[in-house]
Structures are given as C-alpha cells and as structure tokens.
C-alpha cells in the first residue's frame, strides 16, 4: 500500500507526535483537528469497534486515509476494567481521579492478583467506507502498583509496573517507552502491514 499521508483521528498533539515518530518519515500524519474539532461518540463495546469508528469518522471529515487508535488499561482482578472506559473511569475527572479510583478498587489486593495490560488497537481505513480496515493490536503486560511512581508519561503510567525494566512506565524516558509500549507494539505490526519495515 502506497500512502504518503494519513489523518490521525485525534486532537491530541502529543499522540500525533508520538505516533509520527513511530511511523517514520515516509508517511506524514495530519491531525483531524485540521478538518473538524468535533469528536465522534465512542459507542463501540470494544477497542476494535471504537478504533474503526474513529478512523471512519476522520476519513469522512478529511477525504483522506485515516488512522485511529483506541487504547486503555485492562486489569485482571477487575475483569478487564477500566478497559474501553479508561479515560473516563472516574466520570471524566482526569488522570489523577482515574488513578485514585483504580487504587481504591485494588485496595488490599496482593501483588500477584494485580496483573494488568495496556491495550492498543490501531485501525487504518483507506476511505470512510473501507470494508476491510487494517487492524493491529499491541499489548503491554505488567501489574498495578500500590502507589504512583515516576514523572514521565500520562494516564495510568505512574501505576503501571514494567517487569522487564523493574520500574513504572512513568519512570521510562519517552524514547524507551516508545520502544516498549502497547502503542509501539501495535505500530510495529502496522509498519509491517504497510511495508515500511
């Protein structure tokens, strides 16, 4: 597939920069913000459904191929929660409230039952009605700490223990995180599918 530019279905400048770095220079990512500030309602019941919904919407708005990601944290003890509701886990009150709610939900839960994984699904559509979106999933396994640790990252990063580095994901520098994360793992697969390896 020969793509020179994609619209990223996100208004988040940090995510645009992170994904552009992972994608490399042969494909230019543009923000959907160039075309509309309206975000679609995420009505899907899975990461896959929401990623496809966002990609189709961005392609419809821009007339260009579009890439979307839907990501979140799935905690084993909580049956996969907060899952697709990760960003709104504490009713839209932000990262600190989400982290506090998660710590409260896992209060007194021992380390061996605090397994979790960050999940990322990337969906690429060639056009808004693409019958066969390209889907790539990345998982990053770890566990939830009892207290926040680290200054980098965002979201649940300060609570997510990375066993292969013996630290939280918020203690990893951006370049190291961009090699290990769920989003990085999904992007490796997408680059392969696009023939960019």
Curated annotation (Swiss-Prot):
SUPFAM superfamilies attached to this UniProt entry: ITPase-like
Active site: 70
GO molecular function: dITP diphosphatase activity; ITP diphosphatase activity; metal ion binding; nucleotide binding; ribonucleoside triphosphate phosphatase activity; XTP diphosphatase activity
Note accompanying the cofactor annotation: Binds 1 Mg(2+) ion per subunit.
Residues that hold substrate according to the record: 10-15, 71, 154-157, 177, 182-183
EC identifiers of the protein: 3.6.1.66
GO biological process terms on file: nucleotide metabolic process; purine nucleoside triphosphate catabolic process
Tagged with keyword Transport: no
Residues reported in the UniProt entry to bind Mg(2+): 41, 70
PANTHER family xref list: INOSINE TRIPHOSPHATE PYROPHOSPHATASE (PTHR11067:SF9), INOSINE TRIPHOSPHATE PYROPHOSPHATASE/HAM1 PROTEIN (PTHR11067)
Function: Pyrophosphatase that catalyzes the hydrolysis of nucleoside triphosphates to their monophosphate derivatives, with a high preference for the non-canonical purine nucleotides XTP (xanthosine triphosphate), dITP (deoxyinosine triphosphate) and ITP. Seems to function as a house-cleaning enzyme that removes non-canonical purine nucleotides from the nucleotide pool, thus preventing their incorporation into DNA/RNA and avoiding chromosomal lesions.
Family label: Belongs to the HAM1 NTPase family.
Name of the protein this chain belongs to: dITP/XTP pyrophosphatase
Annotated source species: Pseudomonas syringae pv. tomato (strain ATCC BAA-871 / DC3000)
Lineage: Bacteria, Pseudomonadati, Pseudomonadota, Gammaproteobacteria, Pseudomonadales
